[in-house]
Amino acid sequence: MQSTPLNFVPNAAKAPVTPGQAPDARWSREAIEALFALPFNDLLFQAQQVHRANFDANAVQLSTLLSIKTGGCPEDCSYCPQSARYDTGVEAEKLMPIDAVLEAASRAKQNGASRFCMGAAWRNPKPHQLDAVADMVRGVKAMGLETCVTLGMLKQEQAAQLKEAGLDYYNHNLDTAPEFYGEIITTRTYQDRLDTLEHVRDAGINVCCGGIVGLGESVHERAGLIAELANMEPYPDSVPINNLVKVEGTPLAGNEELDPFDFVRTIAVARITMPKAMVRLSAGREAMDDALQALCFMAGANSIFYGEKLLTTDNPEADADRKLLARLGMRVEVQDHMHHESHVGAQSSHCHIDITPAD
């Protein structure tokens, strides 16, 4: 029999917080590090309990991500092949025409996606660029798809414009812990990112915010990223967890491979600390075998990016995704769009589509 919904917050979460952390933080960094230190099976067991209390454990949302403006970005994010500062073979392109974007969105819906994300390699959008993106949002929304964009930094009035267009989610990742951030990016500050997230939240748009693991961060710094996310008020509605995709020409191309179990642990800790968030298995999935992806679902991931490209890096082919989900007995979830202002009603109306692998 289902007991009262579980929101796993150990007593350790009440421990003294780290310097610079708000004294009323829901999760101290020490408590999060304690989760990372749990035996693997214990951590996954707790994460699965939290997941089942808040979601259908056998359902996954399919998202498609389209790069609507590729390359030529002036930023110096050390992991990114779209930076104009690195020779990665990614050529700068113009913003895609609206008709081409809507055609891609239509294909995504036909292939089973319920969420369509649009990414542009900008530091921050100019007024005419934002006007075009707002029109794209309106067109995608008219198809019945959930919408998300990631365009760089936003001003308050720009966030309001996207809200007026009907945008559901704005993605702006923190990437890593504050103290490690300067090792990865120098062209925008951590506070710049927090300011954009505040503008998005104030406009009434759902926040999509996560990070990247495998950048060379320590477990302490990985816990710091989760602490920043989990202690947002409210914590993000959508939390993409990315595994570094090493691209030749970027400063991080020679990084050591992350232990796969450490990636699964990060998914599990995100699920425990942000129980009602959509935890999205994001970049790096192309290099994961089926067993590792299954462990990520067990740990609480309930969304994948679906399609052949994730911005400029490979992503598992759609047919392989369908076959994997079918082998696991998982279903595609098509959720009514929700704005969890206080993360209430995470189990609102939804339907499921059984997955049949293509021949």
Curated annotation (Swiss-Prot):
InterPro entries: Aldolase_TIM (IPR013785), BATS_dom (IPR010722), Biotin_synth/BioAB (IPR002684), Biotin_synthase (IPR024177), Elp3/MiaA/NifB-like_rSAM (IPR006638), rSAM (IPR007197). Belongs to the radical SAM superfamily. Biotin synthase family. [2Fe-2S] cluster binds at C117, C148, C208, R280. HAMAP family: BioB. One of its GO terms (molecular function) is iron ion binding. Binds 1 [4Fe-4S] cluster. The cluster is coordinated with 3 cysteines and an exchangeable S-adenosyl-L-methionine. Binds 1 [2Fe-2S] cluster. The cluster is coordinated with 3 cysteines and 1 arginine. [4Fe-4S] cluster binds at C73, C77, C80. It is an enzyme of class 2 (transferase). Pathway: Cofactor biosynthesis; biotin biosynthesis; biotin from 7,8-diaminononanoate: step 2/2. Residues 1-22 are annotated as: Disordered. Catalyzes the conversion of dethiobiotin (DTB) to biotin by the insertion of a sulfur atom into dethiobiotin via a radical-based mechanism. It catalyses: (4R,5S)-dethiobiotin + (sulfur carrier)-SH + 2 reduced [2Fe-2S]-[ferredoxin] + 2 S-adenosyl-L-methionine = (sulfur carrier)-H + biotin + 2 5'-deoxyadenosine + 2 L-methionine + 2 oxidized [2Fe-2S]-[ferredoxin]. NCBIfam families: bioB. Keywords: 2Fe-2S, 4Fe-4S, Biotin biosynthesis, Iron, Iron-sulfur, Metal-binding, S-adenosyl-L-methionine, Transferase. This is Biotin synthase. The gene is bioB.
